[in-house]
């Protein structure tokens, strides 16, 4: 595991020192103009046995003990070179040593360099046996990478493993600019351990010290080391001034943590954000615990709440052990429904409507797998608190292929549903689904014939409250048995497009599927986990109209579709278009009176869907999709986008997305009842742009307009200045942050963010536009 955020003072000698410079080409090349390179042949291995070469205008001495060289003195051994006006060479026999100890004192215009560093000063000393070197009151410059500074005394020790600075400084700014620097009474940089120790560390902006620590141990390479990360600040209308100061803790080789005090002025307190990562034999995981001891804004808005403590707990784990055991955790829980409205968090969003808490343990061997899981939901609604959890759920699959010409499978599930309310129905559901397939295929097509049996048993309890308030009654014990038959055929035709586009190839891929499922009245079964599935082009060929098992719609239908693709001479897909429809011979029904279109008795071509993609050129791209459902009497969903993308930092995109209110109600019935902002559906047009506007300036922006409400939905504007030693980013965002039921209007949050990045700390000279675009509440999605 590597923490990818550069440490705040890691420059203190070196992340810069050992970063790979392969970045935003223009700026990176400009920054390297002031950086020296090692232009002599690099000597590998132990250089102590190599001869010492000395050139000078004059020489005198007492051979073999002492010698004095004056006038343009130049001493070389291996990769090391020492130059000075005068050099005194001393050679002494050391007891018990086969070789004499050779040292030099250098005076006047001392210059030492090797393949890693250049040291300059008025006075120097070196041990030619050990490569220990001292330079007093001088400057240093890293070779081949940004990094320079000054010190009263600069020392190279341990055959260049250690660089030690007494009263030293460091900056990655080029010569002539000291915009920022780090100074310390002593700095020890260990190249092997990739760590720097700094005593009495002060971080300076220009001549002004803004940060002090009596001792810091900081990472200066790829090895994980504890230390402060780059702080951040912003201003929002929700929390006013906010400031972050993260600290990275390298606990062990297989675990680390990031602890971030997050001050929020309006909340009147500090939120402690704690991220913990780990690796184990059972897999990898991440935990996040955020805790705000008290919140004065929440106290004012919820005077009847006993506690104003706000918190979030997130746990994600995925792993395999002994090649057969699978462990997965996806758990998010917050203190209250307003949490994601009040606080930005990468582990959840107010637009999700709920948080999931899921644990699962699986076992898998050849032809067999089984999973035991529990799943709960925390609904972010103060009006509708009803939600079902699976406590527990068992899923079992057994496969046996090549049974003669057939493939077989048996799927089984047992689950117990519990509601958060005491008066709602609960159930135990047992489902068995044996399947047999006859797959046939050749080079140009395939046909798959499938038959299965859907057998489900429900044992429902706690029905009194529901049955007393509804005309359709639920039964305690229900058995539902449904056969299913399906034939799915595909063909692929190809042709060369030599006449229109030499080297290009076009495919035509027709597909047809017949599906039959008889009708079973399911009105005596409560809907515990079923919802309408999205009917995009690929969704037209699903077996089920609904997810889950509580609603299995009858089907006597033919689905037809065709896809055409165009590939260039490098086999890159340049264009595709897909169009399909479902033709119903009889009405698709479940018997649920709450599904409004089941009363329409519609047949014929009811559902249409189409998708398209066109890579017009290397820089232009177009995507689109539309789904029409006559049962909803309108277009269910549609989306489109066109994009010009020159490179990562130069792009312009126009997009549109639409979802009808009937479609939202059908797919998210429980969320729809409380989501006032979506009662009229979604119809939003948007624009996203990122472009450098000057030599080192770039701008990024996004704007979304709700055509139903005739008002802005979301917007963002960011400006960044980049130089060789720092970058400044200022951003503004206005985003939808909930709905005021009393005033019946949307609630917006305005945020101003400010961030400074010290350059030369990592290999990234990019403008950061992708990060800014994807952090938006409606994140940028690539069209190309």
From Swiss-Prot:
<dbReference type="Pfam" id="PF03968">
    <property type="entry name" value="LptD_N"/>
</dbReference>
<dbReference type="InterPro" id="IPR050218">
    <property type="entry name" value="LptD"/>
</dbReference>
<keyword id="KW-1015">Disulfide bond</keyword>
<dbReference type="GO" id="GO:0043165">
    <property type="term" value="P:Gram-negative-bacterium-type cell outer membrane assembly"/>
</dbReference>
<keyword id="KW-0998">Cell outer membrane</keyword>
<comment type="subunit">
    <text>Component of the lipopolysaccharide transport and assembly complex. Interacts with LptE and LptA.</text>
</comment>
<dbReference type="InterPro" id="IPR007543">
    <property type="entry name" value="LptD_C"/>
</dbReference>
<comment type="function">
    <text>Together with LptE, is involved in the assembly of lipopolysaccharide (LPS) at the surface of the outer membrane.</text>
</comment>
<dbReference type="GO" id="GO:0015920">
    <property type="term" value="P:lipopolysaccharide transport"/>
</dbReference>
<feature type="disulfide bond">
    <location>
        <begin position="173"/>
        <end position="725"/>
    </location>
</feature>
<dbReference type="Pfam" id="PF04453">
    <property type="entry name" value="LptD"/>
</dbReference>
<dbReference type="GO" id="GO:0009279">
    <property type="term" value="C:cell outer membrane"/>
</dbReference>
<keyword id="KW-0732">Signal</keyword>
<keyword id="KW-0472">Membrane</keyword>
<protein>
    <recommendedName>
        <fullName>LPS-assembly protein LptD</fullName>
    </recommendedName>
</protein>
<dbReference type="GO" id="GO:1990351">
    <property type="term" value="C:transporter complex"/>
</dbReference>
<dbReference type="InterPro" id="IPR020889">
    <property type="entry name" value="LipoPS_assembly_LptD"/>
</dbReference>
<feature type="signal peptide">
    <location>
        <begin position="1"/>
        <end position="24"/>
    </location>
</feature>
<dbReference type="InterPro" id="IPR005653">
    <property type="entry name" value="OstA-like_N"/>
</dbReference>
<comment type="similarity">
    <text>Belongs to the LptD family.</text>
</comment>
<feature type="disulfide bond">
    <location>
        <begin position="31"/>
        <end position="724"/>
    </location>
</feature>
């Amino acid at each position: 595991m590597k923490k990818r955020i550069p440490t705040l003072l890691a420059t203190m000698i070196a992340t810069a020192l050992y970063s790979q410079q392969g970045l935003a080409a223009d700026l990176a090349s400009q920054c390297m103009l002031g950086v020296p390179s090692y232009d002599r042949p690099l000597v590998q291995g132990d250089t102590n046995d190599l001869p010492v070469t000395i050139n000078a205008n004059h020489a005198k001495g007492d051979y073999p003990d002492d010698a004095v060289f004056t006038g343009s003195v130049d001493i070389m051994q291996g990769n090391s070179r020492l130059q000075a006006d005068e050099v005194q060479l001393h050679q002494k026999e050391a007891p018990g040593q086969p070789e004499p100890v050779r040292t030099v004192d250098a005076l006047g215009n001392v210059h030492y360099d090797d393949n890693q560093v250049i040291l300059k000063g008025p006075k120097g000393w070196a041990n030619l046996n050990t490569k220990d070197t001292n330079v007093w009151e001088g400057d240093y410059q890293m070779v081949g990478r940004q990094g320079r500074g000054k010190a009263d005394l600069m020392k190279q020790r341990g055959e260049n493993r250690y660089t030690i600075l007494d009263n030293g400084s460091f900056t990655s700014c080029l010569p002539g600019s000291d915009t920022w620097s780090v100074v310390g009474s002593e700095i020890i940089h260990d190249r092997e351990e990739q760590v720097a120790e700094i005593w009495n560390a002060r971080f300076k902006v220009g001549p002004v010290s803004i940060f002090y620590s009596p001792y810091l141990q900081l990472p200066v390479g790829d090895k994980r080391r504890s230390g402060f990360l780059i702080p951040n600040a912003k201003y929002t209308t929700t929390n006013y001034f906010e400031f972050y100061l993260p600290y990275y803790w390298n606990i062990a080789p297989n675990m680390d943590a990031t602890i971030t005090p997050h001050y929020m002025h309006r909340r009147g307190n500090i939120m402690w954000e704690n991220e913990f990562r780990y690796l184990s034999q059972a897999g990898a995981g991440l935990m996040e615990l955020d805790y705000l001891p008290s919140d004065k804004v929440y106290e004012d808005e919820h005077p009847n709440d006993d506690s104003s403590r706000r918190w979030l707990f997130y746990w994600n784990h995925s792993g395999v052990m002994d090649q057969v055991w699978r462990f997965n955790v996806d758990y998010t829980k917050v203190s209250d429904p307003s949490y994601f409205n009040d606080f930005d968090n990468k582990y959840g969003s107010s637009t999700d409507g709920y948080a999931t808490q899921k644990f699962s343990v699986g076992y898998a061997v050849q032809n067999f797998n089984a999973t035991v899981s529990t799943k709960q939901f925390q609904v972010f609604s103060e009006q509708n608190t009803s939600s079902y959890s699976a406590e527990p759920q068992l899923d079992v699959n057994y496969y046996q292929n090549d049974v003669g010409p057939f493939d077989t499978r048996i799927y089984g599930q047992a689950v117990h549903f519990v509601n958060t309310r005491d008066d709602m129905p609960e159930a135990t559901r047992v489902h068995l689904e044996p399947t047999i397939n006859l797959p046939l295929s050749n080079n140009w097509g395939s046909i798959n014939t499938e038959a299965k049996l859907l057998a489900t048993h429900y044992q429902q309890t706690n029905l009194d409250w529901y049955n007393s308030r509804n005309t359709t009654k639920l039964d305690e014990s229900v058995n539902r048995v449904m056969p299913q038959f399906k034939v799915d055929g595909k063909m692929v035709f190809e042709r060369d497009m030599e006449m229109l586009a030499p080297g290009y190839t076009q495919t035509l891929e027709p597909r047809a599927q017949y599906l039959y499922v008889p009708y079973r009245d399911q009105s005596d079964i409560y809907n515990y986990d079923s919802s309408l599935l999205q009917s995009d082009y690929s969704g037209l060929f699903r077996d089920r109209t609904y997810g889950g098992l509580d609603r299995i719609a009858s089907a006597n239908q033919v689905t037809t579709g065709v896809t055409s693709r165009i590939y260039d001479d490098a086999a890159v897909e340049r264009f595709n278009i897909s169009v399909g429809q479902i033709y119903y011979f009889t009405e698709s029904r479940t018997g649920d009176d709450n599904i409004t279109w089941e009363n329409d008795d519609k047949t014929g071509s009811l559902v249409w869907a189409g998708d398209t993609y066109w890579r017009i050129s290397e820089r232009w791209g177009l995507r689109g999709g539309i789904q029409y459902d006559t049962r909803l009497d309108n277009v269910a969903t549609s989306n489109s986008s066109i994009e010009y993308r020159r490179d990562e930092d130069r792009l312009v995109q126009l997009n549109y997305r639409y979802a009808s209110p009937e479609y939202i109600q059908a797919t998210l019935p429980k969320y729809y009842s409380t989501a006032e902002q979506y009662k009229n559906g979604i119809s939003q047009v948007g624009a996203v742009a990122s472009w450098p506007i000057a030599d080192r300036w770039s701008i990024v922006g996004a704007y979304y307009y709700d055509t139903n409400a005739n008002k802005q939905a979301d917007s963002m504007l960011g400006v960044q200045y980049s130089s060789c030693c720092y970058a400044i980013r200022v951003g503004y965002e206005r985003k939808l942050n909930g709905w005021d039921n009393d005033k019946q209007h949307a609630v917006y949050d305005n945020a101003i963010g400010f961030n400074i990045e010290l350059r030369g700390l990592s290999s990234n000279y990019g403008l950061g536009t992708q990060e800014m675009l994807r952090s938006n509440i409606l994140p940028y999605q690539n069209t190309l």
